[in-house]
Amino acid sequence: MRIEEDLKLGFKDVLIRPKRSTLKSRSDVELERQFTFKHSDQSWSGVPIIAANMDTVGTFSMASALASFDILTAVHKHYSVEEWQAFINNSSADVLKHVMVSTGTSDADFEKTKQILDLNPALNFVCIDVANGYSEHFVQFVAKAREAWPTKTICAGNVVTGEMCEELILSGADIVKVGIGPGSVCTTRVKTGVGYPQLSAVIECADAAHGLGGMIVSDGGCTTPGDVAKAFGGGADFVMLGGMLAGHEESGGRIVEENGEKFMLFYGMSSESAMKRHVGGVAEYRAAEGKTVKLPLRGPVENTARDILGGLRSACTYVGASRLKELTKRTTFIRVQEQENRIFNNL
């Protein structure tokens, strides 16, 4: 047993210090990034935000809606090959280039992903997703995927420490997904005692990944556009959002009615709700590590997307970053004990 004395920080523990700026308007800020990925050697340009691969967020409808904002969607792994075929038949190449194909690490997952990728060459992203990216089996699967799909851009996770980030990049991942426990419907930290404050995880993993020519995506912990800005400021190349994009018309959650008001169910992918839906229930050897919440319906996702992008542009103007790429270089975090004036929050 050992104790690390360094204080680790989440998004709620800091604010970004404003700096002098020559920008005249938020419209002067360029949010689009251009990347060439380490292993796939593929080039990509767009807004580096990703809708999470949850079945109540990462839907085909969400992918179609967010593609118009140049935002990626990690489509959840529970669609059949036939459903993928129908989606591809009805989608433009521009939509497909904003889609990530999600997969688990079983042999069946591998075969299914292979079939999906064979449907259309425009599908360039694979998201290999497990709750715990520290297993040897996971690293071996990433290497197997890289060998099978040498020209596909592979995103793999989740991990929260630099050494595991390096391990995954050396095994074939182009992008490492960072985050254990910060999600809005994740209870891993409560059930297991395991986790890492998200901002510190992002800063440390970005440092490790960038040293090897890899990239990271900050997955979880964002509750506001300001948190998205903090994740980019901390060095994240991409930011993945779940709860912020849940409850919309495109989110795909089941709608329930209570006292004449409609709500959409949103749940973590290790929750009892998810396991009942996809594997018939919670296995007796494990505990559910997610919760289910009812969200008021929030309408089309385009309004939320504009709010997030607007907040991000504004953050850039406050620190004098004319491009999103410059935000991390212009960011100085200050430690704080309060984020906002909450006097009217309950009205």
Curated annotation (Swiss-Prot):
Instruction: Look up the domain of life of the source.
Output: Bacteria
Q: Which reaction does it catalyse?
A: IMP + NH4(+) + NADP(+) = GMP + NADPH + 2 H(+)
Keywords from UniProt, A to Z, are: Metal-binding, NADP, Oxidoreductase, Potassium
Q: Which CDD domains match?
A: IMPDH (cd00381)
Recall the GO molecular function terms of this protein's record.
GMP reductase activity; metal ion binding
Q: What InterPro entries has UniProt attached to this entry?
A: Aldolase_TIM, GMP_reductase, GMPR, IMP_DH/GMP_Rdtase_CS, IMP_DH_GMPRt
Q: Where does NADP(+) bind?
A: 108-131, 216-239
- A Pfam family for this UniProt protein? IMPDH
Q: Where is the active site?
A: C186 (thioimidate intermediate)
Q: Which residues bind K(+)?
A: G181, G183
GO cellular component annotations of the record: cytosol; GMP reductase complex
Q: Name one GO biological process term.
A: purine nucleotide metabolic process
- Which EC class heads this enzyme's classification? oxidoreductase
Give the E.C. number(s).
1.7.1.7
> What is stated as this protein's family in its record?
Belongs to the IMPDH/GMPR family. GuaC type 1 subfamily.
Protein function: Catalyzes the irreversible NADPH-dependent deamination of GMP to IMP. It functions in the conversion of nucleobase, nucleoside and nucleotide derivatives of G to A nucleotides, and in maintaining the intracellular balance of A and G nucleotides.
- Quaternary structure (record): Homotetramer.
This chain's protein is named GMP reductase
Q: Which organism is it from?
A: Shigella boydii serotype 4 (strain Sb227)
Gene name, Swiss-Prot/TrEMBL: guaC
